Amino acid sequence: MAAAERRILTLAIVLASAMVAQAFGRFTWGVVLPDARDDLLDGSNTAAGLFGSLNVGAYLLGTIVVAWLASRSSLVGLVKVGLVLSTSGLALASFTTRPAVLALALVIMGLGGAIIWVPVPGIAARQFPPERRGFATGIAGVGIGVGIVFAGRMAAFLRSGEQDVWQTLYRIELCIALIVIASAFVFLRSQRERPSVAGGFGGFGALRQVQGWKALTGAYSAYGFSYILVISYTVARLEDDAGWTSGRAALAFTTIGFAVIAGGLIVGSISDRIGRRLTMTIAFVSWAVASIGILTGSLPVVLVSTVLVGIMFSGIPATIIAHVVAHADERSFGPVFSATTLAFGIAQAVSPQIGGAIADWRGSFTLVFWLAAAVALIGAMAAWSLPEDDIEVGGDVPTDF
Protein backbone atom coordinates (compact mmCIF):
# COMPACT_ATOMS: atom_id res chain seq x y z
CA MET A 1 0.00 0.00 0.00
CA ALA A 2 1.31 3.46 -0.94
CA ALA A 3 2.33 5.77 1.89
CA ALA A 4 -0.43 8.30 1.12
CA GLU A 5 -3.09 5.59 1.03
CA ARG A 6 -1.82 4.09 4.26
CA ARG A 7 -2.00 7.47 5.99
CA ILE A 8 -5.60 7.98 4.85
CA LEU A 9 -6.57 4.51 6.04
CA THR A 10 -4.75 5.05 9.33
CA LEU A 11 -6.57 8.33 9.92
CA ALA A 12 -9.96 6.79 9.12
CA ILE A 13 -9.46 3.89 11.53
CA VAL A 14 -8.08 5.94 14.41
CA LEU A 15 -10.89 8.49 14.06
CA ALA A 16 -13.44 5.66 14.10
CA SER A 17 -11.66 4.28 17.15
CA ALA A 18 -11.98 7.65 18.89
CA MET A 19 -15.69 7.60 18.06
CA VAL A 20 -16.12 4.20 19.70
CA ALA A 21 -14.03 5.08 22.74
CA GLN A 22 -15.32 8.58 23.46
CA ALA A 23 -18.68 9.17 21.77
CA PHE A 24 -20.01 5.65 22.35
CA GLY A 25 -18.14 4.46 25.42
CA ARG A 26 -18.27 7.70 27.37
CA PHE A 27 -20.52 10.47 26.05
CA THR A 28 -23.52 8.33 25.13
CA TRP A 29 -24.11 8.10 28.87
CA GLY A 30 -25.18 11.76 28.79
CA VAL A 31 -27.79 10.93 26.13
CA VAL A 32 -29.22 7.86 27.83
CA LEU A 33 -28.86 9.13 31.41
CA PRO A 34 -32.54 10.12 31.94
CA ASP A 35 -33.81 6.76 30.62
CA ALA A 36 -31.19 4.63 32.39
CA ARG A 37 -31.64 6.63 35.60
CA ASP A 38 -35.39 6.02 35.65
CA ASP A 39 -35.09 2.39 34.50
CA LEU A 40 -32.33 1.05 36.76
CA LEU A 41 -31.45 3.75 39.31
CA ASP A 42 -34.86 4.67 40.77
CA GLY A 43 -34.67 8.17 39.32
CA SER A 44 -31.70 9.21 41.49
CA ASN A 45 -29.48 11.95 40.04
CA THR A 46 -26.91 11.19 42.73
CA ALA A 47 -26.71 7.57 41.60
CA ALA A 48 -26.53 8.63 37.95
CA GLY A 49 -23.74 11.04 38.85
CA LEU A 50 -21.94 8.25 40.70
CA PHE A 51 -22.15 6.05 37.61
CA GLY A 52 -20.75 8.90 35.54
CA SER A 53 -17.96 9.28 38.07
CA LEU A 54 -17.18 5.57 37.80
CA ASN A 55 -16.74 6.01 34.06
CA VAL A 56 -14.43 8.99 34.35
CA GLY A 57 -12.68 7.46 37.37
CA ALA A 58 -11.85 4.47 35.23
CA TYR A 59 -10.66 6.90 32.57
CA LEU A 60 -8.33 8.30 35.21
CA LEU A 61 -7.02 4.83 36.00
CA GLY A 62 -6.64 4.23 32.28
CA THR A 63 -4.32 7.21 31.94
CA ILE A 64 -2.00 5.65 34.53
CA VAL A 65 -2.14 2.33 32.72
CA VAL A 66 -1.44 3.90 29.34
CA ALA A 67 1.53 5.84 30.74
CA TRP A 68 3.03 2.48 31.70
CA LEU A 69 2.01 0.81 28.43
CA ALA A 70 3.39 3.67 26.34
CA SER A 71 6.95 2.61 27.13
CA ARG A 72 6.17 -0.97 26.12
CA SER A 73 3.82 -0.72 23.15
CA SER A 74 3.49 1.30 19.96
CA LEU A 75 0.71 3.86 19.62
CA VAL A 76 -1.15 1.51 17.28
CA GLY A 77 -0.90 -1.27 19.86
CA LEU A 78 -2.50 1.00 22.44
CA VAL A 79 -5.42 1.74 20.11
CA LYS A 80 -6.11 -1.98 19.68
CA VAL A 81 -6.02 -2.66 23.42
CA GLY A 82 -8.41 0.23 24.04
CA LEU A 83 -10.81 -0.99 21.36
CA VAL A 84 -11.05 -4.41 22.97
CA LEU A 85 -11.99 -2.82 26.29
CA SER A 86 -14.45 -0.28 24.87
CA THR A 87 -16.24 -2.88 22.78
CA SER A 88 -16.48 -5.26 25.73
CA GLY A 89 -18.03 -2.52 27.86
CA LEU A 90 -20.58 -1.69 25.18
CA ALA A 91 -21.54 -5.37 25.04
CA LEU A 92 -22.21 -5.47 28.78
CA ALA A 93 -24.22 -2.23 28.76
CA SER A 94 -26.29 -3.46 25.83
CA PHE A 95 -27.83 -6.43 27.62
CA THR A 96 -27.60 -6.03 31.39
CA THR A 97 -30.63 -5.59 33.64
CA ARG A 98 -28.55 -5.06 36.79
CA PRO A 99 -27.16 -1.72 38.00
CA ALA A 100 -23.92 -3.37 39.17
CA VAL A 101 -23.21 -4.76 35.71
CA LEU A 102 -23.98 -1.41 34.10
CA ALA A 103 -21.50 0.17 36.50
CA LEU A 104 -18.90 -2.41 35.48
CA ALA A 105 -19.59 -1.68 31.81
CA LEU A 106 -19.03 2.04 32.35
CA VAL A 107 -15.78 1.29 34.17
CA ILE A 108 -14.51 -0.87 31.32
CA MET A 109 -15.50 1.76 28.75
CA GLY A 110 -13.71 4.41 30.78
CA LEU A 111 -10.51 2.36 30.73
CA GLY A 112 -10.79 1.80 27.00
CA GLY A 113 -11.49 5.47 26.38
CA ALA A 114 -8.24 6.57 28.01
CA ILE A 115 -6.11 3.92 26.35
CA ILE A 116 -7.43 4.88 22.91
CA TRP A 117 -7.50 8.65 23.35
CA VAL A 118 -3.88 9.09 24.40
CA PRO A 119 -2.35 7.71 21.16
CA VAL A 120 -4.99 8.97 18.68
CA PRO A 121 -3.97 12.67 18.59
CA GLY A 122 -0.31 11.73 18.30
CA ILE A 123 -0.97 9.45 15.35
CA ALA A 124 -3.14 12.09 13.65
CA ALA A 125 -0.70 14.95 14.27
CA ARG A 126 2.26 13.11 12.80
CA GLN A 127 0.48 12.86 9.45
CA PHE A 128 0.93 16.62 8.92
CA PRO A 129 3.84 19.08 8.84
CA PRO A 130 4.60 21.07 12.02
CA GLU A 131 2.90 24.26 10.81
CA ARG A 132 -0.42 22.36 10.56
CA ARG A 133 -0.26 20.67 13.96
CA GLY A 134 -3.23 22.61 15.35
CA PHE A 135 -5.37 21.55 12.41
CA ALA A 136 -4.08 17.99 12.69
CA THR A 137 -4.90 17.60 16.37
CA GLY A 138 -8.33 19.06 15.62
CA ILE A 139 -8.96 16.17 13.26
CA ALA A 140 -8.85 13.82 16.23
CA GLY A 141 -12.15 15.29 17.42
CA VAL A 142 -13.98 14.66 14.15
CA GLY A 143 -14.74 11.03 14.98
CA ILE A 144 -16.03 12.00 18.41
CA GLY A 145 -18.32 14.62 16.90
CA VAL A 146 -19.73 12.19 14.36
CA GLY A 147 -20.43 9.72 17.16
CA ILE A 148 -22.17 12.31 19.32
CA VAL A 149 -24.38 13.36 16.41
CA PHE A 150 -25.20 9.74 15.72
CA ALA A 151 -26.04 9.01 19.36
CA GLY A 152 -28.25 12.07 19.72
CA ARG A 153 -30.21 11.58 16.51
CA MET A 154 -30.54 7.82 16.95
CA ALA A 155 -31.86 8.35 20.49
CA ALA A 156 -34.46 10.80 19.19
CA PHE A 157 -35.49 8.36 16.46
CA LEU A 158 -35.81 5.45 18.87
CA ARG A 159 -37.79 7.49 21.38
CA SER A 160 -40.36 8.29 18.71
CA GLY A 161 -41.34 4.62 18.66
CA GLU A 162 -40.36 3.19 22.05
CA GLN A 163 -40.54 4.22 25.69
CA ASP A 164 -37.17 2.85 26.88
CA VAL A 165 -34.46 3.02 24.26
CA TRP A 166 -31.17 3.38 26.08
CA GLN A 167 -30.08 -0.24 25.65
CA THR A 168 -31.22 -0.31 22.04
CA LEU A 169 -28.88 2.59 21.36
CA TYR A 170 -26.00 0.81 23.07
CA ARG A 171 -26.68 -2.31 20.98
CA ILE A 172 -26.52 -0.35 17.74
CA GLU A 173 -23.26 1.22 18.86
CA LEU A 174 -21.92 -2.23 19.73
CA CYS A 175 -22.49 -3.39 16.15
CA ILE A 176 -20.54 -0.41 14.83
CA ALA A 177 -17.76 -1.02 17.36
CA LEU A 178 -17.39 -4.61 16.17
CA ILE A 179 -16.81 -3.38 12.62
CA VAL A 180 -14.23 -0.84 13.80
CA ILE A 181 -12.30 -3.32 15.93
CA ALA A 182 -12.20 -5.83 13.07
CA SER A 183 -10.87 -3.13 10.73
CA ALA A 184 -8.23 -2.11 13.24
CA PHE A 185 -6.86 -5.61 13.69
CA VAL A 186 -6.86 -6.29 9.94
CA PHE A 187 -5.57 -3.01 8.53
CA LEU A 188 -3.97 -0.94 11.31
CA ARG A 189 -0.34 -1.99 11.64
CA SER A 190 2.90 -0.45 12.80
CA GLN A 191 5.58 -0.52 10.14
CA ARG A 192 8.33 -0.46 12.76
CA GLU A 193 7.38 -1.05 16.38
CA ARG A 194 8.97 1.72 18.42
CA PRO A 195 7.56 2.20 21.91
CA SER A 196 7.75 5.53 23.65
CA VAL A 197 10.60 6.39 25.96
CA ALA A 198 10.11 5.97 29.69
CA GLY A 199 8.79 9.14 31.28
CA GLY A 200 8.77 8.49 35.00
CA PHE A 201 5.72 7.56 37.07
CA GLY A 202 2.59 8.44 35.12
CA GLY A 203 4.73 10.23 32.55
CA PHE A 204 5.35 13.21 34.84
CA GLY A 205 9.10 13.01 34.43
CA ALA A 206 8.66 13.63 30.71
CA LEU A 207 5.92 16.23 31.26
CA ARG A 208 8.21 18.44 33.35
CA GLN A 209 10.39 18.91 30.28
CA VAL A 210 7.50 20.61 28.45
CA GLN A 211 7.55 24.41 28.43
CA GLY A 212 4.68 25.82 30.51
CA TRP A 213 3.69 22.41 31.84
CA LYS A 214 2.12 23.71 35.05
CA ALA A 215 -0.19 26.14 33.28
CA LEU A 216 -0.98 23.54 30.64
CA THR A 217 -1.87 20.94 33.26
CA GLY A 218 -4.01 23.44 35.14
CA ALA A 219 -5.90 24.42 32.00
CA TYR A 220 -6.54 20.81 31.02
CA SER A 221 -7.74 20.02 34.55
CA ALA A 222 -10.18 22.93 34.48
CA TYR A 223 -11.45 21.74 31.12
CA GLY A 224 -11.92 18.21 32.48
CA PHE A 225 -13.98 19.40 35.44
CA SER A 226 -16.14 21.82 33.46
CA TYR A 227 -16.83 19.96 30.24
CA ILE A 228 -18.09 16.77 31.88
CA LEU A 229 -20.69 18.73 33.84
CA VAL A 230 -22.06 20.31 30.68
CA ILE A 231 -21.93 17.16 28.55
CA SER A 232 -23.39 14.92 31.26
CA TYR A 233 -26.23 17.15 32.38
CA THR A 234 -27.36 19.21 29.38
CA VAL A 235 -30.10 16.75 28.41
CA ALA A 236 -31.25 16.32 32.02
CA ARG A 237 -31.18 20.10 32.59
CA LEU A 238 -33.34 20.79 29.55
CA GLU A 239 -35.81 17.98 30.27
CA ASP A 240 -36.09 18.30 34.06
CA ASP A 241 -35.64 22.05 34.61
CA ALA A 242 -36.68 23.71 31.36
CA GLY A 243 -39.53 21.32 30.55
CA TRP A 244 -38.22 20.36 27.14
CA THR A 245 -39.41 17.18 25.47
CA SER A 246 -36.89 14.37 25.16
CA GLY A 247 -36.81 14.87 21.39
CA ARG A 248 -36.00 18.57 21.66
CA ALA A 249 -33.35 17.91 24.31
CA ALA A 250 -31.81 15.26 22.07
CA LEU A 251 -31.73 17.84 19.26
CA ALA A 252 -29.74 20.19 21.49
CA PHE A 253 -27.29 17.40 22.29
CA THR A 254 -27.01 16.63 18.59
CA THR A 255 -26.04 20.22 17.80
CA ILE A 256 -23.12 19.74 20.18
CA GLY A 257 -22.03 16.77 18.11
CA PHE A 258 -22.29 18.62 14.81
CA ALA A 259 -20.20 21.46 16.21
CA VAL A 260 -17.63 19.04 17.65
CA ILE A 261 -16.98 17.74 14.13
CA ALA A 262 -15.79 21.14 12.95
CA GLY A 263 -14.71 22.66 16.26
CA GLY A 264 -11.31 21.06 16.56
CA LEU A 265 -10.47 21.90 12.96
CA ILE A 266 -11.60 25.52 13.33
CA VAL A 267 -10.00 26.26 16.69
CA GLY A 268 -6.89 24.23 15.88
CA SER A 269 -6.39 26.14 12.64
CA ILE A 270 -6.87 29.46 14.43
CA SER A 271 -4.23 28.45 16.96
CA ASP A 272 -1.81 27.80 14.09
CA ARG A 273 -2.23 31.46 13.13
CA ILE A 274 -2.56 33.42 16.37
CA GLY A 275 -0.91 31.05 18.87
CA ARG A 276 -2.05 28.49 21.40
CA ARG A 277 -2.20 30.80 24.42
CA LEU A 278 -4.59 33.41 23.02
CA THR A 279 -6.73 30.82 21.26
CA MET A 280 -7.07 28.68 24.37
CA THR A 281 -7.94 31.67 26.56
CA ILE A 282 -10.71 32.81 24.22
CA ALA A 283 -12.00 29.24 24.00
CA PHE A 284 -12.32 28.91 27.78
CA VAL A 285 -14.17 32.22 28.08
CA SER A 286 -16.50 31.11 25.29
CA TRP A 287 -17.17 27.87 27.15
CA ALA A 288 -18.18 29.80 30.27
CA VAL A 289 -20.58 31.98 28.27
CA ALA A 290 -22.11 28.94 26.59
CA SER A 291 -22.62 27.15 29.91
CA ILE A 292 -24.64 30.09 31.19
CA GLY A 293 -26.56 30.31 27.92
CA ILE A 294 -27.90 26.78 28.38
CA LEU A 295 -29.50 27.91 31.64
CA THR A 296 -31.86 30.29 29.83
CA GLY A 297 -34.03 27.48 28.48
CA SER A 298 -34.75 29.63 25.43
CA LEU A 299 -34.58 27.49 22.28
CA PRO A 300 -32.54 29.94 20.15
CA VAL A 301 -30.13 30.78 22.97
CA VAL A 302 -29.70 27.15 23.97
CA LEU A 303 -29.02 26.04 20.41
CA VAL A 304 -26.43 28.78 19.90
CA SER A 305 -24.88 27.84 23.24
CA THR A 306 -24.73 24.14 22.41
CA VAL A 307 -23.07 24.93 19.09
CA LEU A 308 -20.49 26.97 20.99
CA VAL A 309 -20.06 24.14 23.51
CA GLY A 310 -19.43 21.72 20.66
CA ILE A 311 -16.85 23.94 19.00
CA MET A 312 -14.93 24.43 22.23
CA PHE A 313 -15.45 20.83 23.32
CA SER A 314 -13.08 19.70 20.57
CA GLY A 315 -11.29 23.03 20.13
CA ILE A 316 -9.81 23.32 23.62
CA PRO A 317 -8.20 19.84 23.58
CA ALA A 318 -6.92 20.50 20.06
CA THR A 319 -4.91 23.50 21.25
CA ILE A 320 -3.70 21.68 24.36
CA ILE A 321 -2.58 18.66 22.35
CA ALA A 322 -0.94 20.89 19.74
CA HIS A 323 1.13 22.46 22.52
CA VAL A 324 2.19 19.00 23.71
CA VAL A 325 3.03 17.85 20.17
CA ALA A 326 5.10 20.98 19.66
CA HIS A 327 7.23 20.15 22.69
CA ALA A 328 7.51 16.35 22.42
CA ASP A 329 8.84 14.05 19.74
CA GLU A 330 7.02 10.90 18.65
CA ARG A 331 8.73 8.77 21.31
CA SER A 332 7.99 11.01 24.30
CA PHE A 333 4.48 12.03 23.24
CA GLY A 334 2.83 9.02 24.91
CA PRO A 335 4.21 9.61 28.43
CA VAL A 336 3.82 13.40 28.21
CA PHE A 337 0.22 13.33 27.05
CA SER A 338 -0.56 10.54 29.53
CA ALA A 339 0.59 12.77 32.38
CA THR A 340 -1.51 15.75 31.29
CA THR A 341 -4.46 13.43 30.74
CA LEU A 342 -3.99 12.02 34.25
CA ALA A 343 -4.53 15.48 35.77
CA PHE A 344 -7.46 16.00 33.41
CA GLY A 345 -8.85 12.63 34.47
CA ILE A 346 -8.72 13.45 38.17
CA ALA A 347 -10.76 16.59 37.56
CA GLN A 348 -13.41 14.87 35.49
CA ALA A 349 -13.57 11.90 37.88
CA VAL A 350 -14.92 14.03 40.74
CA SER A 351 -17.02 16.36 38.61
CA PRO A 352 -20.13 14.24 37.75
CA GLN A 353 -20.68 13.12 41.34
CA ILE A 354 -20.43 16.71 42.56
CA GLY A 355 -22.85 17.83 39.85
CA GLY A 356 -25.38 15.10 40.64
CA ALA A 357 -25.24 15.80 44.37
CA ILE A 358 -25.74 19.53 43.77
CA ALA A 359 -28.72 18.82 41.51
CA ASP A 360 -30.38 16.64 44.16
CA TRP A 361 -29.59 19.18 46.89
CA ARG A 362 -30.92 22.19 44.99
CA GLY A 363 -33.64 20.40 43.05
CA SER A 364 -32.30 21.69 39.73
CA PHE A 365 -29.16 21.85 37.60
CA THR A 366 -28.80 25.65 37.70
CA LEU A 367 -25.93 25.78 40.18
CA VAL A 368 -24.21 22.93 38.32
CA PHE A 369 -23.92 25.02 35.16
CA TRP A 370 -22.79 28.11 37.06
CA LEU A 371 -20.05 25.95 38.58
CA ALA A 372 -19.05 24.77 35.10
CA ALA A 373 -18.78 28.39 33.94
CA ALA A 374 -16.70 29.45 36.95
CA VAL A 375 -14.21 26.62 36.49
CA ALA A 376 -13.94 27.45 32.79
CA LEU A 377 -12.86 30.97 33.72
CA ILE A 378 -10.17 29.47 35.96
CA GLY A 379 -9.05 27.53 32.89
CA ALA A 380 -8.86 30.78 30.94
CA MET A 381 -6.51 32.24 33.54
CA ALA A 382 -4.31 29.15 33.40
CA ALA A 383 -4.24 29.29 29.60
CA TRP A 384 -3.18 32.93 29.66
CA SER A 385 -0.19 31.90 31.81
CA LEU A 386 1.21 29.70 29.02
CA PRO A 387 4.31 30.89 27.14
CA GLU A 388 3.41 32.82 24.01
CA ASP A 389 5.44 30.88 21.47
CA ASP A 390 5.46 27.15 20.71
CA ILE A 391 8.76 25.44 19.91
CA GLU A 392 8.47 22.64 17.37
CA VAL A 393 10.69 19.66 18.15
CA GLY A 394 8.70 16.91 16.48
CA GLY A 395 10.49 17.10 13.15
CA ASP A 396 9.27 15.58 9.95
CA VAL A 397 6.24 13.35 9.69
CA PRO A 398 7.32 9.84 10.69
CA THR A 399 6.31 6.72 8.87
CA ASP A 400 5.91 4.55 11.96
CA PHE A 401 3.57 4.64 14.92
Question: What is each of the regions a protein language model found here?
Answer:
Residues 29-30, 212-254, 261:
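Extracytoplasmic gate region of multi-pass secondary transporters
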Residues 139-188:
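Helix-loop-helix hairpin linking two adjacent transmembrane segments in secondary transporters
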Residues 330-362, 372:
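A late C-terminal transmembrane helix in Major Facilitator Superfamily
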Residues 274-320:
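C-terminal transmembrane helical hairpin of 12-TM major facilitator-type secondary transporters
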Residues 61-97, 271, 277:
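Conserved MFS/SLC helix-loop-helix module at the cytosolic interface between two early adjacent transmembrane helices
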Residues 1-5, 190-216, 401:
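Juxtamembrane intracellular "pre-TM" segments in multi-pass secondary transporters
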Residues 106-142:
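Cytoplasmic helix-loop-helix junction between adjacent transmembrane helices
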Residues 42, 74, 95-100, 243, ...:
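Helix-breaking motifs and short loop linkers at transmembrane-helix boundaries and internal kinks
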